[in-house]
Amino acid sequence: MQAKSICFIGGGNMAQAIIFGLLKQGYPANQITVSDPNAAKRQCLAEKGVNTVEASQTDTQDAVETSEVLLLAVKPQMIAAVCQGLSAVDFSQKLVISIAAGVSVTKLQSRLPTAKQIVRVMPNTPALVAEGMSGLFAQNSLKPEYKQFTQDLLNAVGKTCWVTQEADMHTITAGSGSSPAYFFLFMEAMQQALCQMNMDEDTARLLVQQSALGAAKMVIENPDLPIATLRENVTSKGGTTAAALQVLNQQQLQHIVQQAMQACVERSQQMEKLF
């Protein structure tokens, strides 16, 4: 990836995950600037050689003006204030990337009228361990070099996929943005069940986390096999696995998952109207 000067507005967990992922790939730290009001976060980043500024309007505006790329890594309710503070900046020759949930490209364009090159990103928390999944959307006018740069940027912390319709970002939210929590809940339930069977907590956690990791790896390493086939391959008729799956099917697990993901989509749609 050809390095560009990047200014991050916000230095929270997701911003740090991206920054540290870039640094691990050899991205020059002096090409990265972070604006954040938290002194401890700035210190942590500065120790890695990253430029930092306090979140004052003047310092932030100066940092953005001298950068080729602006990456908005703040909560969606802060977007309006952040963009207002950058109203004097000319974005016509800059790439703007937003990881603020629920903030549409159209809304960003209205907040930053001179910005013509905008990418909306929905990352997820496994980016913190370089195993993230990010959905990306941009209008057709996005320059190819900016599209590639954004993809490379997010690939530093996992995998990426592009959608051609912004409405699909709601589905991305259900499929990857929020989905780590679904897996955490299922793993939590398994751990609790084992503990109720007199398994100690540490051993129960080990059994669950390694089984989850192994199952995910089998899916990844067998791309031509449907996930259903992998399930069928470990389910012997009349066996222990079949007994467990019968209960899950009786409780309509698949229907519950579908309902949960639909609720996620609907809430994402509602949030987009708020910001």
UniProtKB/Swiss-Prot annotation:
Its main location: cytoplasm. The keyword NADP applies. GO terms for molecular function: pyrroline-5-carboxylate reductase activity. Its EC number is 1.5.1.2. GO terms for cellular component: cytoplasm. It is found in: Cytoplasm. It catalyses: L-proline + NADP(+) = (S)-1-pyrroline-5-carboxylate + NADPH + 2 H(+); L-proline + NAD(+) = (S)-1-pyrroline-5-carboxylate + NADH + 2 H(+). It is an enzyme of class 1 (oxidoreductase). Keywords: Amino-acid biosynthesis, Cytoplasm, NADP, Oxidoreductase, Proline biosynthesis. Pathway: Amino-acid biosynthesis; L-proline biosynthesis; L-proline from L-glutamate 5-semialdehyde: step 1/1. InterPro entries: 6-PGluconate_DH-like_C_sf, NAD(P)-bd_dom_sf, P5C_Rdtase_cat_N, P5CR-like_CS, P5CR_dimer, Pyrroline-COOH_reductase. This is Pyrroline-5-carboxylate reductase. The lineage of its organism: Bacteria, Pseudomonadati, Pseudomonadota, Gammaproteobacteria, Pasteurellales.
